[in-house]
Swiss-Prot record:
Family statement drawn from the similarity comment of this UniProt entry: Belongs to the peptidase T1A family.
Main location group: cytoplasm
Source organism (scientific name): Arabidopsis thaliana
Gene3D superfamilies named among the record's database cross-references: Glutamine Phosphoribosylpyrophosphate, subunit 1, domain 1
Keywords in alphabetical order: Cytoplasm, Nucleus, Proteasome
SMART domains listed in its UniProt record: Proteasome_A_N
Function, in words: The proteasome is a multicatalytic proteinase complex which is characterized by its ability to cleave peptides with Arg, Phe, Tyr, Leu, and Glu adjacent to the leaving group at neutral or slightly basic pH. The proteasome has an ATP-dependent proteolytic activity.
Xref: Pfam families: Proteasome, Proteasome_A_N
Classification via SUPFAM superfamilies: N-terminal nucleophile aminohydrolases (Ntn hydrolases)
Compartment annotation: Cytoplasm; Nucleus
Assembly information from the UniProt record: Component of the 20S core complex of the 26S proteasome. The 26S proteasome is composed of a core protease (CP), known as the 20S proteasome, capped at one or both ends by the 19S regulatory particle (RP/PA700). The 20S proteasome core is composed of 28 subunits that are arranged in four stacked rings, resulting in a barrel-shaped structure. The two end rings are each formed by seven alpha subunits, and the two central rings are each formed by seven beta subunits. The catalytic chamber with the active sites is on the inside of the barrel.
Protein name: Proteasome subunit alpha type-6-A
Gene Ontology cellular-component terms listed: cytosol; nucleus; plant-type vacuole; plastid; proteasome complex; proteasome core complex, alpha-subunit complex
Transmembrane segments: none
Length: 246
């Protein structure tokens, strides 16, 4: 076996290759892209919004049972991109942690603390031979009393960062390029602008116009900081506004 080939170093999650790579963690990132979904998050001046594709793989499936948007608490939402089964496991643990936090301290778990907890959990999965990383990138969103709207992204390696706008999944880089142009002037988006920027970014990278039933939109607003998913009718209104504007 040649030292630089990488062969043998992808068997165990805890062993670095001679080039300093952890192959199993890299494969987890590939699993996120292989799911074929793209998600986008945008932070406005008084709201935060995430948009993700809703692909129903089987015509016999009940559409309402397919989702990548998960409420963690009443005030925090999470959009999971990647392997859905891994996402549900992560969501359940995050809900338990948030409930425990509220019971212990008497107030809701802040968005940044939850994002850090998810990242810490993911990081531990990269250290032990008997575990595997989760094939999920999670975007966590909410409105903080002190810091306003917050959007965090947590990945399988255990990174977590706050973002003005971000993307995950198959067309991540294209979406980031689009968002960088949109956010260059550091705009203060209203609620409608925030939602429509996120939706139009997804339209741009997928190069297609989609129906309201083919995407999911999750929002949190400062005036009413509860996480909720927009209805099909509300999404339709935003799609109409985008097409009229363009």
């Amino acid at each position: 076996m040649s030292r630089g080939s990488g062969a043998g170093y992808d068997r165990h999650i805890t062993i670095f290759s001679p080039e300093g790579r952890l192959f199993q963690v890299e494969y987890a990132f590939k699993a996120v892209k292989t799911a074929g979904i793209t998600s986008i998050g945008v932070r406005g001046k008084d709201s935060v919004c995430v948009v993700t594709q809703k692909k129903v793989p089987d015509k016999l499936l009940d559409q309402s049972s397919v989702t990548h948007l998960f409420p963690i608490t009443k005030y925090i939402g999470l959009v999971a991109t990647g392997i859905t089964a891994d996402a549900r496991s992560l969501v359940q643990q995050a809900r338990n942690q948030a409930a425990e936090f509220r019971f212990t301290y008497g107030y809701e778990m802040p968005v940044d603390i939850l994002a850090k907890w998810i990242a810490d959990k993911s990081q531990v999965y990269t250290q032990h031979a008997y575990m595997r990383p989760l094939g999920v990138v999670a975007m966590v969103m909410g409105v903080d009393e002190e810091n306003g709207p917050l959007l965090y992204k947590c990945d399988p390696a255990g990174h977590f960062y706050g973002h003005k706008a971000t993307s995950a999944g198959m067309k991540e880089q294209e979406a980031v390029n689009f968002l960088e142009k949109k956010m260059k002037e550091n705009p203060s988006f209203t609620f409608d602008e925030t939602v429509q920027t996120a939706i139009s970014a997804l339209q741009s990278v997928l190069q297609e116009d989609f129906k309201a039933t083919e995407i999911e939109v999750g929002v949190v607003r400062a005036e009413n900081p509860e996480f909720r998913a927009l209805t099909t009718e509300e999404i339709e209104e935003h799609l109409t506004a985008i097409s009229e504007r363009d």
